[in-house]
């Protein structure tokens, strides 16, 4: 290699080391490395840090700074890419300049995400254009090298060149897979439009692309990020859906054994990163070991907070959910209250969730003090979300507004918590599909027969939905059909979401009871389509659509295997 090539490669290695520092929550060390030079790679590292800071704070000034740094990095990368191509300069064993193309593609993706976070239609349109450019870059690289990428990683004998090869290979696979996976999760109509522009949403291929780097080079930066994204997908979208194909490798619809094996390798490579114990807790919760998950999270919470503030938010939120799911109501409430101090942008949700936990503790443990705490949290919520349009804010406004009217009809006596009908915590557990993470013992603790003094017919619908879901998760699927049929027949209710989800639950029941036969699958698909097209004033429609899309993907594959 020439002296110029060696210097470029050294700059590249320094920046990769900085990126790995980020995975260990060593932001100061990473920033120092990125500022140690002014090469296009150093500028890219600075842009990544600025992007992370912008996303975590959501401050307009940081978004602007991030965009400026990305623009500067892209300009420098483009110049170096052209120079490498012109002078046939290799850093890896792939094409001259390919490292710069991967970096440009990554910068374009980050820039597009920033644009989508803005409220400007013009900026959003520009973001679509940037996505298209990034998509084109990675498509060209894949067309030329995908067969090589999909094979085992081979060492060249030089660690720096191996690092460059690793960057190109894992970076391309991650960006390609993540881009394709996100498209596959969009609403069907939007996918149809994007297909016109050449975007394809093949979910199976996307997951394959993301698993390749995680399996080949699990400790590398892009591979670790790919693995983290996979865990987020499995713990988020996949856990929301109760229709999945069971195989020896994926007994619960996702590769649990493989995930734990890769996580162990990543944890050894990044022992100081709080992100990885958080992901261990997620996996433990997904395999119905919530007690173990809570221990991991509480060990994390006892340590000094991560330098990345958003990581602390994610850790505490996971702890709050696991406590709520495992009937530790006061612990869950306290974690939700802590979240309010860490992230004031979602105060209403955290306060409502905390109030729901306190109220459940009143019902189960006769905790009179918790009733007062619940009322105190509920009082300001209606005004707090008065002008907000996010689905959960709309749900909270409607629910609290109903309590205010009930209290007014009783002469405005007492706290709002005294006028709650069916358990709001049970409803929130359903929205997050926490029932899927529970053991039979945890499920059996849900009192789905309890009637409250202020409970009305709308509350009855929600209670029936939760009862059917608990019974199904306990394996008593035959008992849920008459319950769900009664809900599906409802034509007028303020709890539209519950009726829409009842159609989805009917599909799940058909899949579990008769999913091995074509007739059962057709009934299942029919109810999934009814759920998708239900419409109405459903605050949780986006969550329903995600479940339906994932479910129909499974059902269609089952039907294809029978034809």
UniProtKB/Swiss-Prot annotation:
One of its GO terms (biological process) is cellular detoxification. It is found in: Cytoplasm; Nucleus. GO terms for cellular component: cytosol; nucleus. The keyword Transmembrane does not apply. Pfam families: Iml2-TPR_39 (PF10300). Belongs to the IML2 family. InterPro entries: Iml2/TPR_39. This is Inclusion body clearance protein IML2. Transmembrane segments: none annotated. The keyword Chaperone does not apply. Keywords: Cytoplasm, Nucleus, Phosphoprotein. Inclusion body (IB) resident protein that interacts strongly with lipid droplet (LD) proteins. Involved in LD-mediated IB clearing after protein folding stress, probably by enabling access to the IBs of an LD-stored soluble sterol derivative that acts as a chaperone in inclusion clearing. It comes from Schizosaccharomyces pombe (strain 972 / ATCC 24843) (Fission yeast). Interacts with lipid droplet proteins.
